[in-house]
Amino acid sequence: GRPFSWGARPAAGSRGAAWGVHGGGAAGGGGAPGPAALGPVELHAADIDPAAVRCARRNVTGHVHTGDLFAALPDGLRGRVDVLAANVPYVPTGEVALLPAEAREHEPLTALDGGADGLDLLRRVALGAPDWLAPGGCLFVETSERQAPAAVEAFTRAGLTASLAESEELYAHVVIGTKP
């Protein structure tokens, strides 16, 4: 992959998937660039966890929705999303018990457990994204180095042009999918 600059980390309290809308399209929760960098912004954020939604409502200037992934977003955004960022759990079910105690004891399981291989929610987001993205719109999802090849494949199978961005400094891997 290519190096990238990651200027923001997901917000504290972020659970499950976070979404938002920029300029006519969508971008995500705490990982979204600041509005000044984007010009006019219409921001939408969503989460299935009520505590995360309450936190977002206190901290996000924009629309905050409660619900499961795309089901939480207004239908009027379909096909208009320019940037979509999802903060989905990617820890495989069998490895959740190996996480540090502070994560296991203070985060809901839904914020940690990504399914058998850790990619269940990533696949759901990738499959749903093409219906919401505008042509040329991009989906961004963080994953692990080990899961990156399968995550890129999931984006490709969903019809997105996939690439991988890596930051050695932050030990972060982000799959980027662009709608043709």
Region locations from a protein language model:
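Conserved Class I SAM-dependent methyltransferase catalytic core
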Residues: 116-177
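Conserved SAM/SAH cofactor-binding pocket of Class I
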Residues: 1-98
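Mobile active-site "lid"/loop adjacent to the S-adenosyl-L-methionine
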Residues: 88-120
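Short, solvent-exposed coil/turn segments
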Residues: 41, 74, 105, 136, ...
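Alpha-helix initiation/capping motif
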Residues: 45, 74, 111-118, 144
